[in-house]
Each structure stands twice: as C-alpha cells, then as structure tokens.
Amino acid sequence: FDCILGFNLDTAVFDWGMQIQENQYRFRAARFDPTSDDGPMMLNRMHINNVHCNAAGMYIGGRRTGGMLHYNGKTITMAVTLPTGTHNAQPFRDGVLFNDSEANVVRYTGRGEGDEDRAIEVPIYGDEEMTHLWANDGEVARPHFARGLCQVTDSVVAGGSSPSTVSIYDLRENKRVVEVAISRDVRNAIHGLEIWPH
C-alpha cells in the first residue's frame, strides 16, 4: 500500500508506519499508527520493494517509484532516477547499486563520467535446464528476473535471480565470478539477500 512499516524489536510490534504519497514526482511522508484501525488508503501505485537505511537516512525503491527515494526523517526527495522495474536500489560508493530487473542485469552507476558504470548479466538458463515452466504465467518471477542484492566488499556484491540463484559479482572486473543455483524451479525466486551476521 505504498507504505513502510517499522518493527520494534523490543516489543515485537509494528509500531510505526509511513505512507509515501506522490503527485507529479513530489513526494510526501504521511505517518500513521499501524496498530490503530485508521490506516492509509490501500493503494499500490509504486510497488515498493526495498528499504535501505544508513546514517544519511532511509532509501526506498520500487518498480514504479521513478528512482531511489530518500527520507531524511522529515521529507522525501528523489535521490536518483532509475529505470522502471528496478529492485533493491541502494547507495553504493559514490553512486547507486540496483537490480535492473527488466534488463536482467545488476547495475552500478557512479556520479562521474561513466567510467565506473557497470551492467553485469544474471545467469541465463535454457528451458531444458529449468523445471515447472508451465507455472511461468506472469504471477511468478519470470526466469532471469534480477532481485535480491547486498554488498559484500567495496567492489564485490551478491545478487539474486530467478530461478533461485545467488551470484557473486566483481564490479572492479565487471564480471560474475560464481553462481549457486539453489533450485531450477521457476516457481522459486530470491527476494532479498543479506550478509549474516551483520
């Protein structure tokens, strides 16, 4: 519903909520109490798919947000524009790292002249290598869909793709160095990745 929920680890309750409202690329944070009966309208215009927090604030991405949004605790602004259909957008070095799910690639784009820009293809499997292709009806993540992303080092990232594959990408070398297919069933897909413990 174009919302972010905050989970309180001490009380084990979702006790903070924020709906992101947009009007012609102007964004507004509308706070609400998720424990009350009064909540936001049930809209899913932005298809929010990830939140990344650091000392600079909260970064929010979605398939239809137009880019990576930044919430500083008061206001929401567009930090950077991105292609439609992106997943897992997050600040990285001096730019942005994200899954360009429509193009089946992991992308890093720096703020410079493009010398550091990277686009590395996710693993591509032939139909004969995958199972349950009959389920690929648009309701599940299609094969080769890039989703799930986390930083390993300042030049290495882990990314997910469908069907259930985790790959390691070396941005310095601009290549995928290893992949592990957990399943070749198209009904199964990676959603998020994180280094543990963190």
Q: What do these predicted ranges mean?
A:
Residues 8-11, 71-75, 110-113, 171-174:
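Short loop/turn segments that connect beta-strands within beta-propeller blades
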Residues 2-5, 66-69, 104-107, 165-167:
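Structural signal for beta-propeller blades
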Residues 11-44, 116-142, 181-197:
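Surface-exposed loop and turn segments in beta-propeller and other repeat-based domains
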